[in-house]
């Protein structure tokens, strides 16, 4: 059974990311399953699942650039910044297309963004949504995020379709809310689809019904990608049997030629063995994470 690798799934609207993880854990029999970047229940699209030792790769995947297609609905603001929340403002007005085009540049590049009150951001040790549900009004500090692309795809008032490419930690719900505030109409996020997570575009994702059938029939392993696919930008160091034994016991291996930064160690078949870090002036590769026993 393949207990080391990735499944890139097209998450449907409805389940939480944690529910998807639980279903896959039960359906595959793999005891350790995690995800590399939460998608809200009402969002669909690319969700990267990590199996077995590959859960230790989530730190490299969760911080990658994400791409989304979003629907912003003007005229109504909500407490959750999406369609689920209590309405807090109803202006009944949608801005003109030219007004939107004029303000979009303000939301590109480095942007100060305050997370939604209903989010998993910690406030004094508790998640913001827990405080909000208890009737508190959590004070969330703004954070700097980077929006590298923000394109107007179409506009049929009151609904604006956007394409967004952004850094990890960007809340598209906050982007929708902030657009409404800037245009003085109010707005909320009416739809969201993640079209890329790091190196994985939507067209590489397995449709959820296909994965469900695969789990029912015992053929889910066909959808497992090699763990090395999570690290396409890292240089590869092919390790021989001697190096394999050294890494197994946490020992460094020679770097030939001298190197810097981090790399991935693979065997002759391309299987990921470890994440390496250059030490001793680049003459050695020290194993930062080892994925075999």
Regions picked out by a protein language model, each given a short descriptive name:
Residues 1-168, 172-205:
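Catalytic cores of RNA-modifying enzymes
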Residues 1-12, 18-35, 39, 43, ...:
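Accessory RNA 3′-end/elbow-binding domains used by RNA modification enzymes
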């Amino acid at each position: 059974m393949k207990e080391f690798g990735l499944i890139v799934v097209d998450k449907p609207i409805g389940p939480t990311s944690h529910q998807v993880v639980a279903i896959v854990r039960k359906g595959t029999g793999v005891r350790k399953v995690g995800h590399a970047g939460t998608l809200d229940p009402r969002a669909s699209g690319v969700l990267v699942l990590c199996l077995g030792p590959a859960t230790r790769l989530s730190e490299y995947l969760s911080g990658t650039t994400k791409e989304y297609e979003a629907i912003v609905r003007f005229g109504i603001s909500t407490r959750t910044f999406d369609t689920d929340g209590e309405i807090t403002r109803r202006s009944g007005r949608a801005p003109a297309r030219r007004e939107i085009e004029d303000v979009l540049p303000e939301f590109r590049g480095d942007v100060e963004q305050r997370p939604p009150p209903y989010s998993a951001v910690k406030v004094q040790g508790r998640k913001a949504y827990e405080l909000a549900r208890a009737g508190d009004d959590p004070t969330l500090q703004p954070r700097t995020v980077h929006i590298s692309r923000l394109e107007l795809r179409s506009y049929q008032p009151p609904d604006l379709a956007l394409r967004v490419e952004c850094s990890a930690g960007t809340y598209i719900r906050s982007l929708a809310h902030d657009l409404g505030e800037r245009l003085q109409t109010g707005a909320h996020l009416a739809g969201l689809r993640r079209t890329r997570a790091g190196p994985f575009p939507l067209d590489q994702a397995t449709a959820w019904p296909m994965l469900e059938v695969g789990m029912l029939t015992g053929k889910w392993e066909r959808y497992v990608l090699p763990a090395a696919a999570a690290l396409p930008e890292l240089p590869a160091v092919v390790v021989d049997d001697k190096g394999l034994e050294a890494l197994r016991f946490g020992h460094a291996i020679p770097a030939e030629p001298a190197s810097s930064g981090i790399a991935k160690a693979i065997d002759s078949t391309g299987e990921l063995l470890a994440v390496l870090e250059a030490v001793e002036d680049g003459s050695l590769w020290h194993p930062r994470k080892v994925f075999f026993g």
